[in-house]
Amino acid sequence: MWAGVAGLRGSCAGLQALWGGHRAALLLGRSPALHTSVASCGSKNLLKKFASKTRKKFWYEGPSLGSHLTPRPSKHEFLTKTTSKKTRKEDSIRLRVLNGLLYKSLTELLCTPQVSQEVYDLNVELSKVSVTSDFSACRVYWKTGVSAEQNKHTESVLQRSAAYMRHLLISQQTLRNVPPIVFVQDKRDLVLAEVDRLLAEADFGPPDERDDLDGLRNADAQVPHDSPEPAAHPNLCGIDHEALNKQIMEYKRKKERGLQCQSLAPPSGREQAPEPTRLLRKREKVRSRWQHRDASPRSFLLGEEDEDEDSSTEWECHAHEAEDDDDHQEEELGADRGAQRGLCGKREQG
């Protein structure tokens, strides 16, 4: 009890001291400021900090802190970019099966006008379907053409129809949950065609040079038909080709003349036939000369064959004429003998 009374007295004494000090300050400096203790203000600030729910603000904002100022990729870029997350073996098998199912279903949709007549008229051919490992996107690769404008138009039409195609796949119960479909150009065929073009250019040169070579070849091929042949030089390497050609043609004519004389054997009327032994000797001489004579163009050009040619042709002509005369004489003798036998028979009967 006495302790409580002593405490009250102490507090009253403190209040009086404070009031006295305040009055003294007003009298001396007439300042309206109040002097308070530092301990009481510090405790209030700490309580406010603990009671408030505001977080600490960062002065430097960056992508690691999730700032709203950093640029975010679009939805299309997010769906088309490759994922770096590694897949397990069982997940890869499951994804392979899903890719096959989606490829089959999407191919059937594109082959029918069920999606739209515009998509059906494009006649798009798919190369493969790839579902991401986190099942966030379904990338459908389609084969591009040569024209860049046509490829751009096809891509825009397919992207517009992607949501409706996803709705059709879900309604057909191909999968319970089909990820968003994104159509991606498969440029593998274009890359292969570019590689073939570069290899052909490395082997045969650029197209301009190849066209020039083709034009030169065609010009060479058309020269014999369009323009007359240039006249050959008469003397080449010291040889008169014109005279040589004449000699060759003369040699050919003589050969043909000899063959014609051998084949022709017309009857020359009744003439005195040579003796048989003489004819046989002439034939043997002709045969031996034809067998052993040199019938090459070289001997003809050197003039070694002219005499043999003339003599052999004459002997052969005489031999054929003699043979024809012998045959004709034998026929006449046979006719005369038949006539004589007929006369003898008539005389005997008379």
From Swiss-Prot:
Please tell me where this protein is predominantly located: mitochondrion
* Xref: Pfam families: RBFA (PF02033)
Q: Which family does it belong to?
A: Belongs to the RbfA family.
Q: Which keywords accompany this UniProt record?
A: Mitochondrion, rRNA processing, Transit peptide
Q: Where is the transit peptide?
A: 1-41
Where in or outside the cell?
Mitochondrion
Gene responsible for this protein: Rbfa
GO CC terms: mitochondrion
The scientific name of the source species is: Mus musculus (Mouse)
Q: Name one GO biological process term.
A: rRNA processing
List where Basic and acidic residues composition bias occurs: 334-350
Q: Where is the composition biased (Acidic residues)?
A: 303-313, 322-333
Q: Where is this region: Disordered?
A: 203-237, 255-350
Instruction: Report biased composition (Basic residues) as residue ranges.
Output: 279-290
What name goes with this protein?
Answer: Putative ribosome-binding factor A, mitochondrial
Which domain of life does the protein's organism represent?
Eukaryota
